[in-house]
Structure formats: C-alpha cells, structure tokens
C-alpha cells in the first residue's frame, strides 16, 4: 500500500514538470531599477515626503570652530579694538601699518589710554575696516606758540605719561594759546583720512589751566565739508582716574582738496593721515581661535565649507559663502524614487519588474534586466539609460551653488542710539530678506527634486518602451514590468534584447505557435502560480486518498489479498 502511495506521489511530481512556467519553450524578462533598503526622504512640489535612493544635504549647519588663516589674510585684534589700533593706544602699538582682509575683534578687547568717544563710531570703524590697512604717513603740521605732545597718567607708555601715538595733544605754552590756523593740501592721487579730536575738560579751572581761554573752539574744513566743535566742560563718569573726555572726529580729503584746521584751544591735532584703499576688507566680532587651515567662508562661529548652497550657522559672513537660511536641513535628490524590494517573491522565486518594486543589490547601474529561462536566472545593468540619467543629475548641485553663493561679505551693521529707528528698519529688512531666501531655497530644492524624480521615472519608461518595440508580438506585457517571451530564449537571446540587436523575425513563427498552445484557462492574477500549485497539490492528495480507500475496500471484500512475510 505504501508503495502505491509513493508511486502516486512520484507521478504527481513528474506531471508537475509540464505546468506552465516550467516550460523550456518560454522565458521571462523583467525590467527594473535600483533600490536600497532604507532610502532618504525629500520634499517635492507635489509631495512633502517621498523616498529616494540617494540625496545630498544642502544646508551647512556647523562650523570648524576656528577661523582659517588661508586664503584670507586674518588680523587678530587680540586685546585691541580696531579704533584703538587706529588711534595708537599704547598697548596696540604692534598694529601700526598692519594690513588685513578680515580684522577679528575679540570680546576681551579693551582701551588703555585717555577716555574717549567717537560720535560716529560705527561709520569710522566700517570705513577703516573696508580700507584694510592702518598704513600711516606723518606730515609736518606747523603748530606755533603752543606746547605739543601732551600726555596723561591714564595712558602710560612704559613708565612715562603718554597719549595716542597718532594724535598730538596741544596745550598752552607759558600763559598763551594763540589761534592755530593750519592748512594741508592733498597732492596725492588717493584719499587721505585725517583723525583729530576735541578735549572736554572736567572743570573750568582745567580748561583755563590747559588752554587759557574759558571756551575753546575747533573748526576743520575742506572744500566739501566743515565741522565746528565747541568743547563741553563738565564732569563725567570716572574712567581710569579721569572725568574729562576726548571726542574723536575724522575728515576725508580728496585728491586736489585741502585740509584747513582752525582752533583757539582744546584741539587734539592729527600727526598725519591714513592711506585709504578700496577693496573687500572687513571686520568681524568673534572669539573663535585662528587656525592653520583653508576656507573661503568665515563666520563668527568659525570657518565653514562653501561646498553647499545654504548655511544656517550665522547671518554674519565674510568671503564666498553659502546663503543664510532658516532651515536646518534641505535635501536635494540625487537618486531615483526608492521602492524597496519585497523580501519574498513566492515559493518558487518568481521575478518581478519595476511596477511592483525596485531591485536591491544592483550596484553596477540604476536600470537593468532580470531574466528567467531554460538556463536559469540572471541580472545585468543597462549602462546607457543609467548614464543618461546620471549625466542630467550631475552638476545639479553645482548649479544650485552658483545660483546662491554670495561672492561678497555680509558685514555687521551698527547704528548709534540716535539712529535707533533706522536700525529697527534695517533689522526688519534683513529679517524679511532671510525669510524670502528661506522660502526661495525650499521652493528651488522642491522643484529640482521633482525634476529628478520625473527624469528617472522617464528613463525607466523609455527603456521599457524600447524593449517592447523590440519584442513586438513575440512577447506579452505581464503588467508588472515584465515580458513573457513565447519562444525559447537562451542567455545569448536575452543579451541581444538588452543590447538592442534582437531580431524578432527570427523567433516570430515559434512565438506565434506557442501562443496558440495556451491551456484552456489562464489566470491573470499575480497569484496564479500559487493557485495552480495549491490546486494541483490538493488534486494529488485527493487522488491518493481515493486510491487508498479503494484498496482498503477491496481488501475488506476479499477482492485483494495482502500477504505480509517476515
């Protein structure tokens, strides 16, 4: 009895070899695209989150933590502000005649000379910073009847009382202070920057002790401008043991113009002029250390790479820098739509095309073919369609960078207290610009991502249509990205389809003949193999049960006798 059941099972297996799908006279060819187990989510115009095989981050969100000393010339202010270095504070003498691309002011900087103020501090600081030099030329001003080179215990230069090295403090000689009237023409071809000041004594006694007159006056003129300053005598908060002050002013003399200085007291006179240069130099407040490295873009947080189009490290930048945006991340799709491969393809390992899912492990191309024929299964990439897609995507990042990177610096903007409304307006304008750029950046990236996904989908469809045109009536579109080929197609035949040399006329008669031999009922469901095999297995099982029942009935009736020998 067991022998009969075993023979029945062997018969079923033998019969199974003739089921559809195991016919050596047909083959299956599927087209598909690359996929990865875990893709990257990006935003497009039509979808906030769509998964792609690869994406590049466009927002630089961190700095190196140090300011690179190359290719820009960095001048570290250390303990000196730019204005202190300009005036010649004793502890800033090392900055005389220095040059820079970027002057870095530190929070620890301090003044260590006569207390002063600059009524237009921000403008002077910006003017000198953009000039990029502290180159100073001494001139021989003719001050008559007065004592020069005044000093103070608040401004020690070594053990001696001193003063700002670029300024000349004039006071009475004996008991007189004659009116000073000095001219200095500009016969050069460049602008000259003159720094001068007015002394405001603490008391009337200090005023007359230094300048004789109870009230002094200083007038500085050129052909284009005139400034008249009257000292304000009075007590002020004590700084470094002094209650008096010096106010610093500045005048630019154009080529061919002339500087005229008139004063009857309280004049802090210039010793010469600073050369004015035009350029892209600037100043930045930062406590980041100076490091030996190379970076085109500098922020107060430190240098950052400029290989991305956007950054959210700091609004203040110097050099060729990414555009500042509010977003922490913006991802640019550099791969195709990702549809991870299903882990199981049925109990007989059926293959599927791009309409169902992508293919993982296809590392030699983005698009390719899988086949199943009498020689087994195989896979190969289609390099031409892959290269077409890559060529169009390559350079996308560089084009975005070219559109957005600033080839100039975004300097700090400062205003005096009386210009508070202007400062508020400027801040509003800057914030609006940032909001606008942030929106534009998100829109630009979404458009590029949409284009990339549409492009890669289009290349897949082009390859599928190219294959369909080759096969014509020799194959049937299975609806899942695969073709059922109705003739024997070995590996060489599959290769000819891939490389475009397939001749459908050679196989036409065989394919048509096989088409007409289709069994009576052909299931179109994607689960037809499952249903066929389950139905066949049940049929075999029932056949065995019936046969076993017949044998047992015959034995019971005596029609069949079973002898068991030991």
Curated annotation (Swiss-Prot):
Q: Which InterPro entries does the protein's record reference?
A: Capsid_hemagglutn (IPR008980), Hemagglutn_HA1_a/b_dom_sf (IPR013828), Hemagglutn_influenz_A (IPR000149), Hemagglutn_influenz_A/B (IPR001364)
User: This chain belongs to which protein, by name?
Assistant: Hemagglutinin
Q: Name one GO cellular component term.
A: membrane
Membrane topology, as annotated, equals: Single-pass type I membrane protein
From the record, give the transmembrane residue ranges. 531-551
| Topology Extracellular: residue spans | 17-530
Q: Between which residues do disulfide bridges form?
A: 30-482, 68-293, 80-92, 113-155, 297-321, 489-493
Name the gene: HA
Q: Name one GO molecular function term.
A: host cell surface receptor binding
Q: Name one GO biological process term.
A: viral budding from plasma membrane
Coiled-coil annotation: which residues?
Answer: none
Miscellaneous information on this protein: Major glycoprotein, comprises over 80% of the envelope proteins present in virus particle.
Name the UniProt key words of this record, in alphabetical order.
Clathrin- and caveolin-independent endocytosis of virus by host, Clathrin-mediated endocytosis of virus by host, Disulfide bond, Fusion of virus membrane with host endosomal membrane, Fusion of virus membrane with host membrane, Glycoprotein, Hemagglutinin, Host cell membrane, Host membrane, Host-virus interaction, Lipoprotein, Membrane, Palmitate, Signal, Transmembrane, Transmembrane helix, Viral attachment to host cell, Viral envelope protein, Viral penetration into host cytoplasm, Virion, Virus endocytosis by host, Virus entry into host cell
Q: Which Pfam families match?
A: Hemagglutinin (PF00509)
Q: How is it modified after translation?
A: Palmitoylated.
The residues the entry assigns to the signal sequence are 1-16
Q: Which Gene3D superfamilies match?
A: 3.90.20.10, 3.90.209.20
Q: What is the source species? A: Influenza A virus (strain A/Beijing/39/1975 H3N2)
Q: Where is this site: Cleavage?
A: 345-346
Glycan attachment points? 24, 38, 54, 79, 142, 181, 301, 499
Q: Which family does it belong to?
A: Belongs to the influenza viruses hemagglutinin family.
Which regions of this chain are Cytoplasmic-facing, per the record's topological domains?
552-566
């Amino acid at each position: 009895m067991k022998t009969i059941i075993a023979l029945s099972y062997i018969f079923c297996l033998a019969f199974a070899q003739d089921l559809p799908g195991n016919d050596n006279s047909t083959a299956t060819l599927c087209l598909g695209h690359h996929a990865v187990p875990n893709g990257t989510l990006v935003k497009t115009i039509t979808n906030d989150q769509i998964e792609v095989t690869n994406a590049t981050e466009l927002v630089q969100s961190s700095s190196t933590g140090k300011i690179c000393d190359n290719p820009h010339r960095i001048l570290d202010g250390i303990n000196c502000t730019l204005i202190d270095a300009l005036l010649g504070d004793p502890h800033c003498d090392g900055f005389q005649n220095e040059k820079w691309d970027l002057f870095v002011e530190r929070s620890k900087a301090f003044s260590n000379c006569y207390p002063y103020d600059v009524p237009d501090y921000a403008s002077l600081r910006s003017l000198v910073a953009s000039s990029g030099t502290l180159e100073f030329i001494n001139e021989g001003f003719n001050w008559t009847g007065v004592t020069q080179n005044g000093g103070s215990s608040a401004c020690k230069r070594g053990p001696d009382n001193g003063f700002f090295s670029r300024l000349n403090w004039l006071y009475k000689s004996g008991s007189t202070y004659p009116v000073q009237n000095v001219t200095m023409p500009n016969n050069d071809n460049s602008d000259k920057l003159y720094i001068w000041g007015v002394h405001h004594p603490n008391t009337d006694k200090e005023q007359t002790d230094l300048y004789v007159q109870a009230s002094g006056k200083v007038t500085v003129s050129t052909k284009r401008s005139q400034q008249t300053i009257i000292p304000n005598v009075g007590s002020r908060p004590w700084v470094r043991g002094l209650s008096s002050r010096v106010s610093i002013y500045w005048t630019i003399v154009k080529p061919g113009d002339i500087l005229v200085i008139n004063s009857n007291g309280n004049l802090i006179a210039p010793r010469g002029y600073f050369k004015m240069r035009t350029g892209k130099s600037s100043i930045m407040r930062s406590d980041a250390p100076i490091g030996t490295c190379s970076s085109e873009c500098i922020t107060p947080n430190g240098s950052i790479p400029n290989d991305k189009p956007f950054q959210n490290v700091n609004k203040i930048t110097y050099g060729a820098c990414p555009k500042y945006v509010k977003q922490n991340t913006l991802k640019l799709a550099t791969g195709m739509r990702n549809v991870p491969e299903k882990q199981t393809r049925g109990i007989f390992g059926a293959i599927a095309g791009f309409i169902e899912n992508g293919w993982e492990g296809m590392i030699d191309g983005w698009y390719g073919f899988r086949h199943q024929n009498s020689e087994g299964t195989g896979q190969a990439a289609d390099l031409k369609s892959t290269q077409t897609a890559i060529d169009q995507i390559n350079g996308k990042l560089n084009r975005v960078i070219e559109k957005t990177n600033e080839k100039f610096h975004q300097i700090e903007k400062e205003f005096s207290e009386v210009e508070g409304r202007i400062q508020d307006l400027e801040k509003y304008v800057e914030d609006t610009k940032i909001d606008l750029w942030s929106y534009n950046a998100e829109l630009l990236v979404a458009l590029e991502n949409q284009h990339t996904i549409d492009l890669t989908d289009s290349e897949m469809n082009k390859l599928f249509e190219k294959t369909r045109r080759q096969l014509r009536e020799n194959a049937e579109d299975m609806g899942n990205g695969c073709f059922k080929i109705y003739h024997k197609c070995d590996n060489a035949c599959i290769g000819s389809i891939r490389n475009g040399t397939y001749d459908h006329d050679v196989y036409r008669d065989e394919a048509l003949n096989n088409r007409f031999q289709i069994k009576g009922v052909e299931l179109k469901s994607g689960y037809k193999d499952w249903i066929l095999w389950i139905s066949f297995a049940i049929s075999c099982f029932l056949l065995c049960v019936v046969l076993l029942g017949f044998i047992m009935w015959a034995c019971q009736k005596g029609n069949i006798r079973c002898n068991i020998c030991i």
